Amino acid sequence: MTEKADLQPILDRAAAGGRITPEEALDLYRDAPLHALGAAADAVRRRRYAGTEHIATYIIERNINYTNVCVTACKFCAFYAAPKDTKKGWSRDLDDILRRCAETVELGGTQIMFQGGHHPDYGVEYYEEHFAAIKKEFPQLVIHSLGASEVEHMARISKVSVEEAIRRIHAAGLDSFAGAGAELLPERPRKAIAPLKESGERWLEIMEIAHGLGVESTSTMLMGTGETNAERIEHLRMIRDVQDRTGGFRAFIPYTYQPENNHLKGRTQATLFEYLRMIAIARVFLDNVAHIQGSWLTTGKEVGQLSLHYGADDLGSIMLEENVVSSAGAKHRSNRLEIIDLIRKAGRVPAQRATTYEHLVVHDDPANDPVDERVVSHISSTAIEGGTAHPELKLLAPN
């Protein structure tokens, strides 16, 4: 372990563009003064984005949950229903999904996340049909969806290789993977919270296959389910090693565990200081990953704003619909003007981005800020009472 007095040279080296080791990252994450760690991370960000370092981005997207039926039963999840639970379980029909896509386009959204449970009947063919239908009706929408866990599941259902599954859903319309299912990659914490999911090594292997086929992804981390600091850094190390080989991870997105309505209820959550330290150490350690995304959805708008001073260059999405983390207690909401204002008050120029992080609209003049009260995050969508396999669903106004 490095003595605290010896940490500043490591911070200086990282700020100047040098690579740090996992051991050094653990020392910094655990012991470096928060302000010093944040300053080094911000220096890395400014160096990487010299010329556009004054800009912070956001995206308008919709998370379309196509089913909550799932065989995986992760202990941190409050969203899923067991396959035999006909009172709680539901699936959306294609017409409903296409209607939600139409609303997304109308509100200026550019991306959809297709997220749901590991349904025992949904193989590759299901995703091919749905992605192809979405692309036919809305070719302008980017389908940034799923992750290695869904690929492993659909390939098993359809009795095909993971490589074939990726090729087929990519050809049908999938543009990139959302990094879903990473949770915690090291073996011990992963088995504790998601014992039925593939291993962390397998998750990375599938993402590496996808990158090799030209399908990029983001990477994520679920914080605060009982993992150690060393396991958090090991998660980063595993991502960095794959990124050295593929370059296919566009961004890293840590988010915090929400404790309501799940089997881990009462578990000590990651503190907001731990979250900011993770944003900072991720920016310092992941020297080969372009973007670090701050999350206001699980931590709140003020902490999301603070993340822009700790290495984040992006504030995530104005998520027009989200049901998964909200079911576990995340109740933060925002709208487009609030996100623009948060970024501006952090001393940055806000910009709406594409999935691939190109700037679509730079809001450099407040007088020209967009005004549309319908562009609101976190509109929940839940099933009407009933227990059929495909009940009618409705969109509820935010409360």
Swiss-Prot record:
Disruption phenotype: Cells lacking this gene require menaquinone-4 (MK 4) for their growth, and accumulate a small amount of DHFL. The keyword Iron-sulfur applies. It holds the Pfam family CofH_C. Pathway: Quinol/quinone metabolism; menaquinone biosynthesis. PROSITE patterns: RADICAL_SAM. GO terms for molecular function: 4 iron, 4 sulfur cluster binding; 7,8-didemethyl-8-hydroxy-5-deazariboflavin synthase activity; iron ion binding; oxidoreductase activity, acting on X-H and Y-H to form an X-Y bond; transferase activity, transferring alkyl or aryl (other than methyl) groups. It catalyses: dehypoxanthine futalosine + S-adenosyl-L-methionine = cyclic dehypoxanthinylfutalosinate + 5'-deoxyadenosine + L-methionine + H(+). The keyword Iron applies. Its cofactor is [4Fe-4S] cluster. Binds 1 [4Fe-4S] cluster. The cluster is coordinated with 3 cysteines and an exchangeable S-adenosyl-L-methionine. Its EC number is 1.21.98.1. Signal peptide: none annotated. Belongs to the radical SAM superfamily. MqnC family. This is Cyclic dehypoxanthine futalosine synthase. The gene is mqnC.
